[in-house]
Amino acid sequence: MPQQQQQRRMFTAALLALVFILAAVSTTEAGKKEKPEKKAKKSDCGEWQWSVCVPTNGDCGLGTREGTRTGAECKQTTKTQKCKIPCNWKKQFGAECKYQFQAWGECDLNTALKTRTGNLKRALHNADCQKTVTISKPCGKLTKPKPQESKKKKKEGKKQEKMLD
């Protein structure tokens, strides 16, 4: 019997602890005030429009760009941002536009130029870039391949000269 009484006391204690925990949780939830949901404030501000990057020195490297936006209740309508123009980009297509170029084509004998095409890889800050561009450059020296026989004759001639000396 004493063992049954001990089990009843443990069960009663556990039950009281459970009731106490539930009461504590319900009072803390009741004490919280329901916060009214924040209204989603729609901004009257427009999207930022950025100028091209203007290098501080020269035509590449660190520089700044100006940003503007419109809106009646905008706190900020203009701002300046630091930017960088990589010095290895082809500036003739715009410093904001990066192209992936194919290999140089064959030399056009009529124009003495070879060309290659570049596809737009990246446009910084919504720059207006052409999708594809083409560049040309002079072919350089056009040399006719010399026949192998003449090289052999020259080598043989030099060998004979050394023997005579």
Swiss-Prot record:
UniProt keyword annotation of Membrane present: no
An example molecular function term from Gene Ontology annotations: growth factor activity
Record Gene3D superfamilies: Heparin-binding Growth Factor, Midkine, Chain A- C-terminal Domain, Pleiotrophin/Midkine, N-terminal domain
Annotated localization: Secreted
Keyword match Transport: no
One annotated Gene Ontology cellular component of this protein: extracellular space
GO BP field: bone mineralization; brain development; cartilage development; dermatome development; heart development; learning; limb development; neural tube development
Signal peptide, first to last residue: 1-30
SUPFAM superfamilies: Midkine (SSF57288)
Region described as Disordered: 137-165
Record key words, sorted: Disulfide bond, Growth factor, Heparin-binding, Mitogen, Secreted, Signal
Cysteines joined through disulfide linkages: 45-74, 53-83, 60-87, 97-129, 107-139
Region (Chondroitin sulfate A binding) residue spans: 145-165
Pfam families per the UniProt record, alphabetical: PTN_MK_C, PTN_MK_N
Alphabetized PROSITE patterns for the sequence: PTN_MK_1, PTN_MK_2
Stretches for region Chondroitin sulfate binding: 90-97, 121-129
Main location: secreted
Family: Belongs to the pleiotrophin family.
Role description: Secreted growth factor that mediates its signal through cell-surface proteoglycan and non-proteoglycan receptors. Binds cell-surface proteoglycan receptor via their chondroitin sulfate (CS) groups. Thereby regulates many processes like cell proliferation, cell survival, cell growth, cell differentiation and cell migration.
Identification of the protein by name: Pleiotrophin
Organism in which the protein naturally occurs: Gallus gallus (Chicken)
Gene transcribed to yield this protein: PTN
